[in-house]
Amino acid sequence: MAEPRVFLKENRGRIEENYLEQAKNLPRVFAPVDEKLQKCTEEVALACKYLYAFMPYSDIGNYPFEVFLDYAENGVRLWKENPQVADLPEEIFLNYVLFHRVNEEEIAQCRTYFRAEIGSRIQGMNFREAALEVNYWCAEEATYHCTDDRTLSAISVYRRGNGRCGEESVFTVNALRSVGVPARQVYAPKWSHCDDNHAWVEIWCDGKWYFLGACEPEEILNKGWFTNASSRAMMIHSRVFDTKIPEGEVIGTDGMVTMLNELKRYAVTKEITVTVKDTQGLPAEEAEVSFEVLNYSEYAPIAEKKTDSKGTARLTTGLGSLHISARMCSDGEWFYAETVMNTEKEDNCELCLVPQDKRNDGESEEWTAADIFAPHDAPVNTDMPTPEQKAKGNKRLAAANVHREQKVRNWSNPECERFLEKKVNRIEEAIAASYREDLLGVLTEKDRTDCISDVLEEHLELSIPYHGMMKKDTFVSYVLNPRVDDEVLQKYRREIKKHFSRAEKQELRDDPSRIWNLIEKAIISRPEKERSSVITTPAGCIRTCTGSFLSKKILFVAIARTLGVAARLNPHDRSMEYMENGRFVPVLARTEKNCTLILKAGETVQWKYFQNWSIAKLENGRYTSLKLGAENFEDQILNLPLESGNYRILTSNRLPNGNMFANEYHFEIQPGETKEIELVLREADLEDMLENISMPEFMLKTEDGTEVKASDLTADGKHILMFLEEEKEPTEHILNEMMEQEEAFAGYAEQIIFVVRSKEALETPTLSKALAKLKNIQIYYDDFSEIINTLGRRMYVDPDKLPLIIVTNGTLNGIYATSGYNVGTGDMLLRLM
């Protein structure tokens, strides 16, 4: 007779050890946790201990035991009832089925609920089949919607029915884990071919990882709209919170979180070697090497490593350009070096450190060009659904869309309604009632979809005594407002109030800067026990006596507001400020901005910060971009007050093929100095802008409904495909540009293909006028339900913006594409033809 399985037999010892360490460090918090664990079964208690052992301190402070109990009980039930789950390697089960956190989202109970909703749909399925089915359920419940940076909990995404890609993937991972399918979120932290990033989901089955698009179901695994885009990435990573690291290349840490390199599953890769030498030309051991891509006109890190005893660091990456920097501190002095490397052509590079204060010594201040190459389109995942699978998937997705749209139609958060509709029973509550809509109004759209009435009630009740002491706008925004940054909205005012005596409260009101002194004494930072982007709430900081620097700054604002002092984090640099004599003053003395940089725009370029230019300061061996606010050029001039030091200006021109023409300007500015620099954007030649992208076959229809292959339409020479949205300004604009150059376009009319939804579109004024002037243009029809998205994604332009214009040269070979409103597209098309 086989011995009964023992839950987490291989990891039991280290779980207990790590749990005890956490409890030792935070005894006040863990005492009630230990009491509640005594009431759990042995398996559930051990599962809870695993969660507590490897969660960030912020989770320990922010959430009650009952939240994690939901995850533990569901995980144990899956292990007991599902043989597939019980057969998983323990590390896979712990990290990717049991664990509560996916990335930086708010944590809320969801697993038991999701399992109840999904369980019957996957009865008898293996992990592969279950993953595909769960993703259809996810599509029925949520879809993409651009929102702010705060990451919703999985249950909030489910309730409101949408989220950005990071939230969709958090939701999908939780849904998969709820029914025992091992799952994780993976990220392209920054694309190389466009200014953006993306997150999706991987599932583990048959001993391997496979991927899928969150809430974007397909009939097969390893298929998503991002398949081609991911082949052009320089890095794709996953993360693990456990200290026992699975196999894989570690590419950096974020506090307690380890980042793993997953790129080989998506792109053609190679290993590169960086050698760092000190000022004497000797190997620099333990130098920090940052691998960066140019994105949003700044160098953004995608991986970080330390050099070995030979001064070398190695990275597996894609075939494109990386900006590589190295830094090292010796005897209190920082040293720095940087270069740009094209990994397609180079295997190795060498960096020689110099003191950062001498970074610009001996260099003339002038623009230096840098060519940044995106990896070529080279998908390694080429599986495609059969026509039958595709038809089945389209039908199921259409049904999912109908279900979701019915679900979210007219949906609103009932907690908001409950808060607004609370009965006013006493005269003094009438004042509070007048501020209910003001409180909701100061919250973000996202806040209003997941806020809780009881939380808002406490903030309202305990702030009302101060309402007559300042202007209403100030009171609402900087005292009543429960939101400080991107923290989880929770109660904290009552807990803060009882923490101080009446005399202490008055002393802090009289001198709010003393609040920070108290915080610095009482709250310690343990970055090695945190995830930098996960904030400890004000109440969590007080409970655990720990918090990151950002968490402590949020606590300052929370205490000030609780005491009736208007306070905020400065929207540009997140510095703490409180109101004094009608204006905000800083809590910490800022470094004096004792220099002036005068930037000249020139005549031809419209400069947009973090689109085609940025400026960064070199400090502690690292360039950090300045967070400019609404500063605009006036009469082609921008005056920037700066601190003295070394700076780097970047300008970038993103080409249609994904490459970038960059310009760098390094300079030093001294105290009291005024320096003038003219921004310069590098121009591109036509041949630099083109690509050769193989487009998938697709069908268009003639007026009588006959289907025509796109391969036949594009077979000979160059063609212009134009998917038009009649009577909308972007389409009207390109049609007008073509008519303004009627004679030039007439010579190519037979090579121009207009695609519209219906014959009625041809009768609209501008389109009918264009067809009358350019008589030989070909007309075809499509419903725009699928082809637009497929072609837009394939050509790396926004598929949600029309018109979609593609220039081909040969059968299904796309050489140029654009979408939406773009001035000068007509001229570009003529150049290309």
Task: Describe every region a protein language model picked out.
Residues 2, 116, 120-136, 145-156, ...:
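Hydrophobic/aromatic-rich core segments of domains that either
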Residues 270-281, 595-605:
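A short, amphipathic beta-strand motif
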Residues 799-820:
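A short, hydrophobic beta-strand/beta-hairpin element that forms part of a small beta-sheet core
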Residues 768-802:
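Short, internal strand/loop/helix patches
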Residues 295-317, 620-638:
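Short, acidic Ser/Thr/Gly-rich low-complexity loop/linker segments typical of extracellular
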Residues 3-160, 388-544, 554:
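Secondary-structure boundary elements
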Residues 311-325, 329-331, 340-343, 632-657, ...:
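Short Pro-Gly-centered beta-turn/loop motif in secreted/extracellular proteins
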